[in-house]
Structures are given as structure tokens and as C-alpha cells.
């Protein structure tokens, strides 16, 4: 076995903050493994986790309120460095004998804190030097309560006019607390502060790299699977593509992929998947042409939720049929990633951050008699992409925009027909091609075309015609929870519109969606 890339790890306790996963991603980017757990983790579990350091994340609760969340006592007795962020700093202060109270002035957004000399966490880290010689840090605040009395043996690290104790430290025990959020980009020195804590103070080695992750995953898959066979539903999306590349490298011909072409994919996507995996990489891929089956089941159905269920259930039926044809398959591979694992790890008190989980591989039936292989379950999406590059997958495949599970089925409003899908495929391909040519594909988070089954008047030569409408959608977002419409140049939109109308029959009008999320969703259905 190669070196243990989990040997040096950080424990992050979640108190319900929207930023908790962002903290974890920042720690991973530094090159150190970490896990997110609910704040009510048992003391023995904290001890058994054996962290090199602990981060107490933020949260929406109020420390002075009865019954508000507290960190396990083992956090402060284990003898490892502890870093409290926002709520994490407040509960640290309260639990160690300090005092927290509600503030008359709530701080949300940009703030500038005055640094006090001494503690190692901020040593030689600042954004500006004031005229009076005081070092200043530009940070992002989001809090109502504040620490008014520090615990014994703590010293002041930073302050603002409205928050006299903006950061505190117990250097002997290596306990640190900050009232701001170092994990967000608005805190300009946040990365350096986190790195100072994790690498310098906790003493973690930076073992968590794409090359090490790939080698570790390959060895773990070989150990788990042995000489048995593995089945994977290959969709062409990022997660399943990386799983396919990883397992092929680990177990070779023991892997069989089933690629279901449902007739709702992007232009030439089926051929591209086969060329990449079957032809170039030598992966064993069974391609199932199920377009007629899917479109037949979708006939006369206009309700978006019913369309989703039909597409999902039909996929399960097709995959199940193919699976039963294969003999001696013991394992089913899935592209579960770390956010899926976090989302289902609900705290027993219900106060930790819980988002609805989603099922991989279309929600395969529970009665399938396979053992699960989930090689990506420790990784965030950005780590999956980096792993894909490490495994030799092309950049354009690994960093392509998200595509919904039901495919074009939810980008054709109302009933799905082959004619509509063929028109939409071509319009979408033109849009994406021109975005790439203009250098805008990487600037947008998601871009696609939508088919509207309504007819609008157009003029061709001396004649009028009634043809269909296509809408273009492009958004910019960090987390897909909120998004703003992309302000594409008019010249680019004009070129895309002209090509779609001139090159594709039965389109008379192209529109651009200028709705942000909320209130609109990113997809139209």
C-alpha cells in the first residue's frame, strides 16, 4: 500500500452553517483530509477519529439561548489545536468559562478588524497598515451575538468598534477563535489563516493531492473488489465518467459499463461516450439504444414531474434488464460524492445542516443483489474533476456544464417528441459551440437551450411562416442555490440566434432568459 493519505486529518464539527462544506473544501485545497460531522458527536467518537486538529464551524443558533448546540467536551480535552469560527468561537468561549451575549449592532458583510500582536495564527498576516501603525485585515462577518468576556488564559487577537473581541487565542493550548469567516473569498487572507492553523499549528502534512487520491482509490478498489466483477451505469456525466476511468485502471476487464441512450442526450453524446471509453480507453461498454422505448412511454405526457418519473423508472427497467443478462457480477459501482454523504448525516437533535439527498444512478431498485462500490464518496465535486484530469480524462469532459438526469426531457416544455428533441439538440450544440468560440463557456456555470412547443410568426423571403421558439439560458453561480443570468454580449447572442434560425428548420424565433434564481429555477422544468 502507498502512504496513508488519511493519516493527518482535521475534524470539522457542523453547527448548521451554510458555509460548513466550504470550510471542508478549503481544508482539502490546502492538501489535508478532513471530515464534516454533526456537532453532537459522542466524546468517544471524537477521540477515536484521532484528528490532528478540530474546527468548530458556524451556525444559525444563539449561544445564550437555552438548549443551543455545544461542542463535545472531548474537543477541549483531547490536547489538539481547536479553531472556532463565528458560532464555533462563541460556544468555545461559553464552554471554557467566558461569556456571550446578543449584540445591539449585528454585523453582516464586509468588515475591517484591527490585529493585536502576539498569537501565531495571525503572525505576519494582514491586508493593510493604518496610519497609526496598526495592522488591518479585511474580513467577512455574519453574526448577531458576540463574546464579551474571554475565558481564562485567552488573549485578544483582533477587534472592531462594534465587536471588541473579534478574535481570541489561548496559545498554550492552541485554541483559537475568530468572529469572521476565513473560508469565504471576501476574507482576503482567509486561505493563509486556515493554512497557518492546519499546516503550521496542527502540523499536518499535505498528503491530500490528486495523484495520491488516485493511487489510494485504485488500491482500495482492488482490495475491496478482489477478482470479482463490477457493473456501472455510465451516463457520460462527470461522476460516472471518473468512476469508470478509476475502476478501469484498478480492475480492468472486471468492469462492465452499461450506457443507456434514451434519445434525450446532447448532440452526438452517445457516440462521444463510446469513443472515449470503449474505443480510446478499452473499457467494456454495453450501449443500449432505448430511444423508441423512452419516447413511447413519454408520449402524451406534459407534466414535468410525471416525465421525470417515467424517465427514471424506464432507466431502471432497462438497466435491470441488462444487469440480469450478465453473470457473476457481485458489485454495483455508484458515483456517490461527499456532499451526498454529508447531506444524509443528520444530527440526532435535528439542528445540524441537512439538505435533501438525491439518489445516484436514477435511484436503482433496492432488491438488486449487489454490493456497493463508491470510490468517490470522500470527494467534493471539484476534487472529482481534478481526479478525472489525473486519470487522463479530457478537460472538456471533466469541466463540462451540469446536465439534468432526465436530459432533454425537462428542457422540452410539455410533451416530448423525437422532432422536438432533434431540434433542441442542434440548437443547444450551436449555443455551446459559440460560447466556447467567444471564450464565454468557462465564464458561465451552466448554459443550454430550451424548446418551447408554441409557434410564432416568422418571415422567409416573401412568405410568412409559423414555427417553433427556442429560449437560451445561461447563468453564473457559485453553489447553484442562487444564480444570476449571464450578461452575454449582444453580438454573441445575435450570432447564436442567427445560426439557430438559419441552420435549423422549424425555428422562427430565439429568446434569451433574463431571470435570476430565485425566483426562477435554473432549469425550466
From Swiss-Prot:
Q: Report the EC code(s) recorded for this entry.
A: 6.3.5.2
Annotated GO molecular function terms are:
ATP binding; GMP synthase activity
| A family per Pfam | NAD_synthase
Spell out the catalytic residues: 86 (nucleophile), 181, 183
Could you name the domain of life of the organism this protein comes from?
Bacteria
Keyword Ligase attributed: yes
Keyword Nucleotide-binding part of the UniProt annotation? yes
Residue limits of the Glutamine amidotransferase type-1 domain? 9-207
Looking at the UniProt entry, the stretches that span the membrane are none
Gene3D superfamilies hit by this protein: 3.30.300.10, 3.40.50.880, HUPs (3.40.50.620)
Reactions the enzyme catalyzes: XMP + L-glutamine + ATP + H2O = GMP + L-glutamate + AMP + diphosphate + 2 H(+)
Residues the entry annotates as binding ATP: 235-241
Keyword tags: ATP-binding, Glutamine amidotransferase, GMP biosynthesis, Ligase, Nucleotide-binding, Purine biosynthesis
Task: Look up the record and report any one GO term of the cellular component aspect.
Answer: cytosol
Q: Pathway involvement? A: Purine metabolism; GMP biosynthesis; GMP from XMP (L-Gln route): step 1/1
GMPS ATP-PPase domain residues are 208-400
Q: How does it assemble?
A: Homodimer.
NCBIfam families, alphabetized:
guaA_Cterm, guaA_Nterm, PRK00074.1
Query: What is this protein's function per UniProt?
Result: Catalyzes the synthesis of GMP from XMP.
Q: What is this protein called?
A: GMP synthase [glutamine-hydrolyzing]
Q: Please report the organism this UniProt entry assigns to the protein.
A: Marinomonas sp. (strain MWYL1)
* Lineage, highest ranks first: Bacteria, Pseudomonadati, Pseudomonadota, Gammaproteobacteria, Oceanospirillales
Amino acid at each position: 500500500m502507498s502512504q496513508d493519505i488519511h493519516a493527518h486529518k482535521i475534524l470539522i464539527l457542523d453547527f448548521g452553517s451554510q458555509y460548513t462544506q466550504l470550510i471542508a473544501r478549503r481544508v482539502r485545497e490546502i492538501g489535508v483530509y478532513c471530515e464534516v460531522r454533526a456537532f453532537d458527536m459522542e466524546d468517544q467518537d471524537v477521540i477515536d477519529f484521532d484528528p490532528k486538529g478540530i474546527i468548530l464551524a458556524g451556525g444559525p443558533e444563539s449561544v445564550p439561548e437555552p438548549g443551543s448546540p455545544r461542542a463535545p467536551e472531548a474537543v477541549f480535552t483531547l490536547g489538539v489545536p481547536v479553531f472556532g469560527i463565528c458560532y464555533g468561537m462563541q460556544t468555545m468561549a461559553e464552554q471554557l468559562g467566558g461569556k456571550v451575549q446578543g449584540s445591539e449592532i449585528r454585523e453582516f458583510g464586509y468588515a475591517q478588524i484591527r490585529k493585536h500582536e502576539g498569537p501565531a495564527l495571525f503572525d505576519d498576516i494582514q491586508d493593510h497598515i493604518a496610519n497609526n501603525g496598526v495592522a488591518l485585515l479585511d474580513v467577512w462577518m455574519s453574526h448577531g451575538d458576540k463574546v464579551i468576556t474571554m475565558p481564562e488564559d485567552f488573549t485578544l487577537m483582533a477587534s472592531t468598534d462594534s465587536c471588541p473581541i473579534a478574535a481570541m487565542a489561548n496559545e498554550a493550548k492552541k485554541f483559537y477563535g475568530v468572529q469572521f469567516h476565513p473560508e469565504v473569498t471576501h476574507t482576503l487572507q482567509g486561505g493563509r489563516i486556515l493554512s497557518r492553523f492546519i499546516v503550521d499549528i496542527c502540523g499536518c502534512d499535505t498528503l491530500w493531492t490528486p495523484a495520491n487520491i488516485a493511487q489510494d482509490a485504485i488500491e482500495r478498489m482492488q482490495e475491496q473488489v478482489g477478482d470479482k466483477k463490477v457493473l456501472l451505469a455510465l451516463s457520460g456525466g462527470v461522476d460516472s465518467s471518473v468512476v469508470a476511468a478509476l475502476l478501469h485502471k484498478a480492475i480492468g476487464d472486471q468492469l462492465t459499463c452499461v450506457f443507456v441512450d434514451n434519445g434525450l442526450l446532447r448532440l452526438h453524446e452517445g457516440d462521444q461516450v463510446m469513443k472515449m471509453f470503449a474505443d480510446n480507453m478499452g473499457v467494456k461498454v454495453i450501449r443500449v439504444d432505448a430511444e423508441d422505448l423512452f419516447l413511447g412511454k413519454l408520449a402524451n405526457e406534459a407534466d414535468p414531474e410525471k416525465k421525470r418519473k417515467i424517465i427514471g423508472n424506464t432507466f431502471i427497467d432497462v438497466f435491470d434488464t441488462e444487469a440480469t443478462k450478465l453473470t457473476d457480477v457481485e458489485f454495483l459501482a455508484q458515483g456517490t460524492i461527499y456532499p451526498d454523504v454529508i447531506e444524509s448525516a443528520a444530527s440526532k437533535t435535528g439542528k445540524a445542516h441537512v439538505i435533501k439527498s438525491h439518489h445516484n444512478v436514477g435511484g436503482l431498485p433496492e432488491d438488486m443483489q449487489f454490493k456497493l462500490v463508491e470510490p468517490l464518496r470522500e470527494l467534493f465535486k471539484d476534487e472529482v474533476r481534478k481526479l478525472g484530469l489525473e486519470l487522463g480524462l479530457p478537460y472538456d469532459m471533466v469541466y463540462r456544464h451540469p446536465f439534468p438526469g432526465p436530459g432533454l426531457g425537462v428542457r422540452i416544455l410539455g410533451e416530448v417528441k423525437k422532432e422536438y428533441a432533434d431540434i433542441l439538440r442542434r440548437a443547444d450544440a450551436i449555443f455551446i459551440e459559440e460560447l466556447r468560440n467567444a471564450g464565454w463557456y468557462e465564464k458561465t456555470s451552466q448554459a443550454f437551450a430550451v424548446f418551447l412547443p408554441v409557434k410564432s410568426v416568422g418571415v422567409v423571403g416573401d412568405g410568412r411562416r409559423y414555427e417553433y421558439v427556442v429560449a437560451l439560458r445561461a447563468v453564473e453561480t457559485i453553489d447553484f442555490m442562487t444564480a444570476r443570468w449571464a450578461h452575454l454580449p449582444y453580438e454573441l447572442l445575435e450570432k447564436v440566434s442567427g445560426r439557430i434560425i438559419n441552420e435549423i428548420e422549424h425555428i422562427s424565433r430565439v429568446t434569451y432568459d433574463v431571470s435570476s434564481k430565485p425566483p426562477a429555477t435554473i432549469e425550466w422544468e
